[in-house]
């Protein structure tokens, strides 16, 4: 009788330990998968950001040749070209790419709440990217915002003297190289291998 009682206790204890081990394993596996999902989404967003940035840089680099070929200002600027490329790409995919500024010249470039937090982080000067998972209805999306800084080629339109009209007809902001020009937000579809976690925001 005593032996039977001990056997029951042993099997009960073994069962409890097995359940605990299984729970720990599932928690670890879930966490590892979540980290991998984040890593994969972030890597994809960084590649897209670099590609659209390369298009911006290319138009900026060939701007003098474009103007010389036409004999006058062509109206094809880095910002105009990059925005058009972003719109064309976004229209034919589940992704969204656009450009924002804290003081936009165009209302369509105004940031939303998430993007304003990103711009604030950039202004503090400690991060160059801001990203996180966001639930929208029944689905989730990965949001990434990359910093855009004023470079030498930006100064004819955004540099000194502040208030003077640039070639596009807008008033210059009097900005200098290294200032925060704005940001490039990306919205990527989220397809995790496991159910998503609660939203987690990150800045780097």
Model regions: which residues?
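The canonical Cys-X-X-Cys-His
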Residues: 149-171
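Membrane-helix interfacial "entry" motifs
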Residues: 1-6, 10, 192, 196-200
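Juxtamembrane membrane-water interface segments immediately C-terminal to a transmembrane helix
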Residues: 30-53
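Extracytoplasmic ligand-binding sensor domains of the Cache superfamily
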Residues: 50-57, 61, 65-151
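Extended, hydrophilic extramembrane loops/domains of integral membrane proteins
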Residues: 173-184
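Membrane-interface helix-start motif
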Residues: 165-175, 190-204
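Extreme N-terminal signal-anchor transmembrane helix of membrane signaling/transducer proteins, especially
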Residues: 4-31, 204
């Amino acid at each position: 009788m005593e032996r039977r009682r001990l056997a029951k206790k042993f099997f009960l204890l073994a069962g409890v330990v097995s359940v605990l081990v299984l729970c720990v394993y599932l928690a670890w596996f879930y966490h590892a998968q979540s980290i991998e999902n984040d890593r994969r989404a972030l890597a994809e967003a960084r590649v897209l950001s670099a590609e659209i940035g390369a298009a911006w840089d290319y138009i900026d680099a060939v701007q003098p040749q474009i103007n010389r070929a036409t004999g006058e200002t062509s109206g094809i600027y880095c910002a105009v070209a990059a925005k058009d490329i972003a719109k064309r790409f976004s229209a034919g995919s589940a992704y969204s790419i656009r450009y924002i500024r804290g003081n936009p010249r165009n209302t369509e470039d105004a940031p939303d709440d998430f993007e304003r937090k990103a711009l604030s982080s950039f202004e503090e000067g400690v991060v160059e990217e801001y990203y996180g998972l966001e639930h929208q209805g029944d689905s989730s999306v990965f949001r990434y915002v990359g910093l855009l800084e004023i470079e030498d080629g930006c100064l004819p339109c955004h540099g000194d003297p502040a208030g003077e009209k640039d070639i596009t007809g807008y008033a210059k902001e009097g900005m200098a190289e290294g200032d925060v020009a704005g940001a490039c937000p990306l919205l990527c579809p989220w397809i995790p291998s496991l159910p998503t976690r609660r939203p987690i925001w990150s800045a780097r």
